[in-house]
Amino acid sequence: TRSGGACNSHDQCCINFCRKATSTCM
């Protein structure tokens, strides 16, 4: 998983990171 940055809503980063941290998710 990425430690941040722009994520797609279908990206594993968004599912695992952005949904939890509410960080930069496009």
UniProtKB/Swiss-Prot annotation:
Cellular compartments annotated: Secreted
Primary location: secreted
UniProt keyword Transmembrane, yes or no: no
GO cellular component: extracellular region
This protein's record includes keyword DNA repair: no
Keyword terms, alphabetized: Disulfide bond, Knottin, Secreted, Toxin
GO MF annotations in UniProt: toxin activity
Membrane spanning residue stretches: none
Tissues expressed in: Expressed by the venom duct.
Disulfide-bonded cysteines: C7-C18, C13-C25
Source superkingdom: Eukaryota
Family of the protein in this entry: Belongs to the conotoxin O1 superfamily.
More details: This peptide corresponds to allele E1i. Has not been merged with other alleles since they may differ due to geographic variation (see strain in PubMed:19606224).
Protein name as annotated: Conotoxin Eb6.18
Gene: E1
